[in-house]
């Protein structure tokens, strides 16, 4: 038991951060800027999808789930990275590392399945348009989203448990930006072949199978779009599917290169850069891709801004009216004792003069 306790460090040292302060400024600014854009973009999509009645459709329900994923995905890593860049000691506690590992795995696995679900939604909308409302009913949408979340978190529980059970024998230097399965397996002092095989199998299950189904679905989608007679209909269909296809390419491309490529001398540094792109850059780009290419989202955002400005103007008018009524009430009550003063105020405000007893 003592050997097991000694094998678990109290904290991990992250080696990828530089000790030179002048080298830390560019990544700090880049990570902070990306994080702010990610927060703003994904919160905007969630808010617009929830508030605007025209966006209460399966497509935007799944899109808001994706935005929530990206929001949490980035929040699980970037704040700790910003803290480490600013501090002299580049460390993360054991509990923080466990939480980061679990959340990163859970949200990444969920996104793998959710992107496939979103592709199924587009397949039904384009290839079965007359049956779309019957097939993609509200209950099925909730079931598909719940299945994605539950499967992702279940996979994270298994992988995190298997990874953290490996004895570290006092090793605590993580050559990565954050806690991730491949980086933690390298700290183990025993053979990790079984864990690497398990990781490869899970990667095939959550990456290759969904992306294969997505490619097959898009083959049918392209055939259906080409059969559309109107150019406007084709352009709208390709625009909607194009945004999703770009997001799919970014996510699955980086994830497959990170988990399924054979090891090579340059694979370690490439894996760190790919993880950085997948965990920070991709969540920032997803809202931009969907909003810039989606006319409905842009119009809904404009309606939301216009509604907010109108509500603010109404509140200002109500405050002015309330202040005016308050002043007039006070003047009315005050008129008996100071009629000359009230007449002067009413003349100044262009109010109708009243007769005093």
UniProtKB/Swiss-Prot annotation:
One of its GO terms (biological process) is detection of chemical stimulus involved in sensory perception of smell. Its main location: membrane. GO terms for molecular function: G protein-coupled receptor activity; olfactory receptor activity. It is a multi-pass membrane protein. Disulfide bonds join 97-189. The chain crosses the membrane at residues 26-49, 58-79, 101-120, 140-158, 196-219, 237-259, 273-292. It is found in: Cell membrane. Glycans are attached at residue 5. Residues 1-25, 80-100, 159-195, 260-272 are extracellular. Residues 50-57, 121-139, 220-236, 293-357 are cytoplasmic. InterPro entries: GPCR_Rhodpsn, GPCR_Rhodpsn_7TM, Olfact_rcpt. Keywords: Cell membrane, Disulfide bond, G-protein coupled receptor, Glycoprotein, Membrane, Olfaction, Receptor, Sensory transduction, Transducer, Transmembrane, Transmembrane helix. CDD domains: 7tmA_OR2B2-like (cd15432). GO terms for cellular component: plasma membrane. Belongs to the G-protein coupled receptor 1 family. Odorant receptor. This is Olfactory receptor 2B2. It comes from Homo sapiens (Human).
